[in-house]
Amino acid sequence: MENISRLKFFERNGFKMTNPYWAWSGVNKDKKLVMFNVWEHFKEKDNGKLRYIVLCDAWEHATDSSKGFNDSLKNINLVINDDYKLCIAIAEPTVKFAMPVAKEDEEVKIKHIKSSFYFISDVVKENGIYWGYPVKRVNV
């Protein structure tokens, strides 16, 4: 598996991030796709289906990057309201941290992106959490 940055992974797959320093997601307007990176350990089974946390309302005030949250909220709304498809790329953290909101003293940092694939996913909002349910693997 090639170890590349999140920005390089997004660009290589046609997704433009608003700002590579604080953006958590990117958009491919031509293909009507939105890509989010999701944490590898922010997942659970729901009636036998794997799902990942894509975005959480609690993150708005749990991070020093409200720009990143607002940008991601705008992008998830493209999926919900404007017929864009959700894509998720799996990010492995340097260390696992609390779910869905990291504790104040926990490091939240990407070790690497799983760069050989991403998933096209359905999205469901439940109790303030946007869940991505992978439906199709896209090898890249």
Question: How should these model regions be labeled?
Answer:
Residues 1-140:
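Short helix-coil boundary/hinge micro-motifs
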